[in-house]
Amino acid sequence: MKTTAAFLFFIAILFVGCEKDDFTTGIVGIVEYGHADCMPSPEGPKIAYDKYNGVLYFINKRAFENIGNGNLQELKETSIKTIIRNGELAIKLPVDTFLVIIEEVYHNTVDNTLIIEQGVILERDFKFWRCTSF
């Protein structure tokens, strides 16, 4: 009887420990990072993208707009951040508007502004890139 109880307890622990962290409000997608020669050309820059590996920041848009001459690095450190591996993004986020940036490059554009709504898992991909020459 003790063996059966111990076995059932062990199975219950395995089952609980293997549950996914499901969420109902947040974002999933793919993050890519690239580089390009930005010398002027009629075709524009040719960007070579790879799956991103690194830190992705979700900066509160209002806090960013009110930073003035403040320190962007301090704002990043107090923001929501996640580690991206092989480009895979899946994170629970609070309802708000965010500026999404990576460590290597900063862009403040509509393309990386994110509006999170209650009960919605947004599916969105991000492509960040930097110039290797001008």
List PLM regions with ranges:
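Short, ordered, surface-exposed loop/turn motifs in non-cytosolic proteins
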Residues: H35-E74, V95
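C-terminal motif of bacterial Sec signal peptides marking the signal peptidase cleavage site
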Residues: L14-G17
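A short, amphipathic beta-strand motif
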Residues: T25-G34
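Sec-dependent signal peptide recognition
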Residues: K2-L8
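Structured interaction patches on ligand/partner-binding surfaces of diverse proteins
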Residues: E104-F134
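Short, surface-exposed beta-strand/beta-hairpin micro-motifs centered on an aromatic residue
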Residues: S79, R85-L93
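Bacterial signal peptide processing site
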Residues: E19-D21
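Short Pro-Gly-centered beta-turn/loop motif in secreted/extracellular proteins
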Residues: A90-L99, V105-Y106
